[in-house]
Amino acid sequence: MKGKRVLVTAGPTQESIDPVRFITNHSTGKMGYAIAKMCMLRGAEVTLVSGPTSVAKPEFVHVVDVVTAKEMYEEVTKRAKDQDIIIKAAAVADYRPKSVSSEKMKKKDDDLAISMERTDDILKFLGEHKKEHQFLCGFSMETENMLENSRKKLEKKNLDMIVANNLKVEGAGFAGDTNVVTIITGQEEVLSLIHI
């Protein structure tokens, strides 16, 4: 990987509801940070665009901190054209509240409904604007039909590779130091890795 420019995304995003509350997911960023570190150790020039996480920043990696899906979209898309490899490991919010209250929302006796809107699709943009020399890898967290859903995502988003995992499999998912993944390429090659 010496001399290659690699962009990695990691962690969750946070979408504010009010100044106190936000919507997020269980991503810790560990996978993306580990990938960024390994690419750097293999000689790559690495940029890591990271959502909020407590994982220690890897040395000799340029880290760009973001909070929201919009910020991650902006930071990734403005850097994408200059990258040889893009690995999107971040668990970016698919939806955000349509409006954010400027004051803390007070508790009431009735139910609360929050109107949501789609966030910009980072992988869709990357796939549509992929340069001839670029390698694009995405991640797919599933709870059912993992292979089928991941293959569809690989094709729809114009990816070269997708790393799929099933949240219901023991040892897979968020927060752990191990994972159980299946790597799928455009040539229908499937490689299952246990506890990486």
Question: What is the meaning of each model-derived region?
Answer:
Residues 2-4, 133:
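Phosphate-coordination loops involved in phosphoryl transfer and adenosine-cofactor binding
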Residues 4-68:
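Glycine-rich phosphate/diphosphate-binding loop of Rossmann-like nucleotide-binding domains
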Residues 5, 160-185:
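Conserved phosphate-donor
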Residues 13-16, 144, 188-190:
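A short, flexible beta-alpha/helix-coil linker loop
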Residues 18-21, 149, 174-175:
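Short, glycine/acidic-enriched capping/hinge loops at junctions between secondary-structure elements
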Residues 40, 45-170:
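Glycine-rich phosphate/dinucleotide-binding loop and adjoining beta-alpha-beta core of small-molecule
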Residues 146-147, 170-176, 191-192:
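Short active-site-adjacent structural elements
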Residues 194-196:
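Conserved small/polar residues in nucleotide/adenosyl-binding loops
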